[in-house]
Amino acid sequence: MAKTASPGATPPDNGTEPLPDNYEMALAELETLVARMEGGALSLEDSLAAYRRGANLVAFCQQQLEKVEQQVRVLDGATLKPLSSGTAATDGEDDDL
């Protein structure tokens, strides 16, 4: 006997659903998926489909962040330096000057 999907369920994602246009849309969809999964009302099949979709969205978001990081590196060149924890909290002390 086949189980029918609940009325609010989304169809399974077989990897064919297109990715969002941008990072913000992907992140919003990912947050919605997580909330639905944490709600516990999804069937096993829907949970698996949501997990797969979420994994695709996470990979997409990581790629977008890497692209932006690379663009920042190109724009800033060699001037990028890690911010040390004490740099922002110095009281007017200019060690580099």
Curated annotation (Swiss-Prot):
UniProt catalytic activity: Exonucleolytic cleavage in either 5'- to 3'- or 3'- to 5'-direction to yield nucleoside 5'-phosphates
Q: What species was this sequence derived from?
A: Burkholderia ambifaria (strain MC40-6)
Family designation? Belongs to the XseB family.
Chain residue ranges for the region called Disordered: 1-22
Stored PANTHER family: EXODEOXYRIBONUCLEASE 7 SMALL SUBUNIT (PTHR34137:SF1)
Q: What is this protein called?
A: Exodeoxyribonuclease 7 small subunit
Q: What is the lineage of its organism?
A: Bacteria, Pseudomonadati, Pseudomonadota, Betaproteobacteria, Burkholderiales
Quaternary state and partners of this protein?
Heterooligomer composed of large and small subunits.
Q: Where in the cell is it found?
A: Cytoplasm
Function, in words: Bidirectionally degrades single-stranded DNA into large acid-insoluble oligonucleotides, which are then degraded further into small acid-soluble oligonucleotides.
**Does the keyword Cytoplasm belong to this entry?**
yes
- Which UniProt keywords are given for this protein, alphabetically ordered? Cytoplasm, Exonuclease, Hydrolase, Nuclease
Cellular component GO terms held in the UniProt record: cytosol; exodeoxyribonuclease VII complex
Gene this chain is encoded by: xseB
Instruction: Answer yes or no on keyword Ligase.
Output: no
Q: What is its main location?
A: cytoplasm
